[in-house]
Amino acid sequence: MKFTADAEDGTVDVIFEFSGVKTAGKKIVAFETLEYKGKEYAVHADINDNDQTVLIPKVSTTASDKNNGTHMSYAGKDVTIVDKVEVKNIVAGREYTLKGKVMDKKTGNPLLVDGKEITAEKTFKANGENETVELEFTFDASALKGTTTVVFENLYEGDRKSVV
C-alpha cells in the first residue's frame, strides 16, 4: 500500500482482507516492510509479537439429549438438548456471547415449536484462549417424532459476530 507521510512520526492503518473460513482456529501474525523509492527502510517481522497477532476463533460442538447423553432423543413434552461448545483462540479476559438455534436438518430452517424458534444464549468471560460452554435448549418435542435436528451457533464479541 502506498501512502504519503504528513509528519515525521505517525501511523498508517493497513487493512488485510481475507476469508476467515480457512483460518479458523489459527493465529495470524502481520509483518510489514517500509520502503521508499525501492529501498527498504524498516521491517517489522517478529513471529512472536503479540501486538501483531490476531486470533481467529474456532467453534466445535457436540449436542446430546440431557436425559440420556446420546444423540438420540425422545419426542416428549419436555426435551432438553445440551450443546457442548468448545471455543478456541479467543482472548482471555474479554466477554463473549454464544448464541445457538435448533435447526430442522431436513429443511435447513430454524425448528419451530408453536411458531417459535428454539434458541439459547450464554455470555461468558474468557479465562483463557480456549473455553468450553454449554447451551441448553428445552422445548416440547412431542410433535417432532422422526425429526432430525442440528444446533447452529454464533460467537459474538459485543455486537460483532466472530464465528459461525
Q: What residue spans do the PLM features occupy?
A:
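Aromatic sugar-binding surface patches on proteins
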Residues: 4-17, 127-138
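Solvent-exposed serine/threonine-rich low-complexity stretches and specific carbohydrate-binding patches
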Residues: 1-8, 112-129
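Short glycine/proline/serine/threonine-rich loop/turn segments at secondary-structure transition edges
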Residues: 20-30, 141-151
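Extracellular recognition modules
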Residues: 15, 29-35, 99-101, 150-154
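Short, solvent-exposed loop/edge segments of extracellular or virion-exposed proteins
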Residues: 60-71
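Conserved small/polar residues in nucleotide/adenosyl-binding loops
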Residues: 161-163
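Contiguous beta-strand segments within globular domains
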Residues: 70-84
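Short solvent-exposed strand-capping/beta-turn motif centered on an Asx-Ser/Thr pair
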Residues: 88-93, 105
